[in-house]
A protein has these predicted regions:
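Outer-membrane beta-barrel porins/channels
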Residues: 1-225
Length: 225
């Protein structure tokens, strides 16, 4: 296999990562008339993960190595308004302290800003035993020039829409069904690279285009004992 073929060959990885952390959470809730307001703050979770690696052709996941993988702190605000006895509207805002969360190789320093989320939705009690809902979410990431991203794992700013239903199937049981769709924006990351081919070094300019779409269907059962 030539040097160029080696650089572009597939890589195999079999690695399990484990870790634990504690997250203190402070929250407040206030109700007045038809309004309900809430806020919470989740502290940054100091979190290390350890590699248990069986196969690693990438050279990035050495067995037994611990790496930082903190969960960022979150500041969230929300409000709900009772339009009628059966119709409710709500909105919320989330701010993630990504740049304060330690990551492998300190890649959080490549972010240009912290993540922000904007959410809004409606709930409607169609029948005493049936509630339907719909909502949307806008997520904005501060990705800077893209140095934070890699094809191993990535996120880009996104739009999401979702629909759901809650059905009472017994006095102490409720069936929940939900579907949501997320479209991630295109983000182009440009960089220069030197490739060895036929005994020579070739300088190339690359552009990686990151995007994806998620479609999720969820079903759950709530039981009160």
């Amino acid at each position: 296999m030539t040097q160029a073929q080696t650089q572009f060959a597939d890589r195999n990885l079999d690695c399990t990562q484990r870790g634990w952390g504690i997250t203190p959470i402070i929250g407040v809730d206030y109700r007045t008339g038809k309004w309900n307001f809430g806020a919470r703050y989740e502290f940054t979770t100091k979190f290390n993960i350890e590699n248990n690696t069986k196969v690693d052709d990438t050279g990035m996941f050495q067995d037994g190595v611990n790496t930082h993988n903190d969960l960022p702190g979150i500041l969230a605000f929300g409000a709900q308004y009772e339009v009628t006895k059966t119709l409710r509207a709500m909105a919320s805002y989330h701010y993630f302290f990504d740049k304060d969360a330690r990551m492998d190789r300190n890649k959080q320093r490549a972010l240009s800003g912290n993540t922000q989320e904007y959410l809004a939705g409606m709930e409607w009690d169609v029948l005493p035993a049936v509630t339907v809902s719909a909502g949307g979410q806008r997520t904005k990431y501060g990705l800077g020039d893209g140095g934070y991203l890699s094809d191993m794992s990535f996120v880009t700013s996104s739009y999401s829409v979702g629909f759901g239903a809650k059905i009472s199937i017994a006095k102490n049981a409720k069936l929940n069904i939900a579907y949501f769709w997320t479209h991630y924006e295109h983000f182009k990351k440009s960089y220069d690279q030197t490739i060895a081919a036929a005994g020579q070094s070739v300088d190339v300019h690359n552009t990686d285009d990151f995007t994806r779409t998620n479609k999720v269907l969820g079903v759950g059962l709530d039981i009160d004992f």
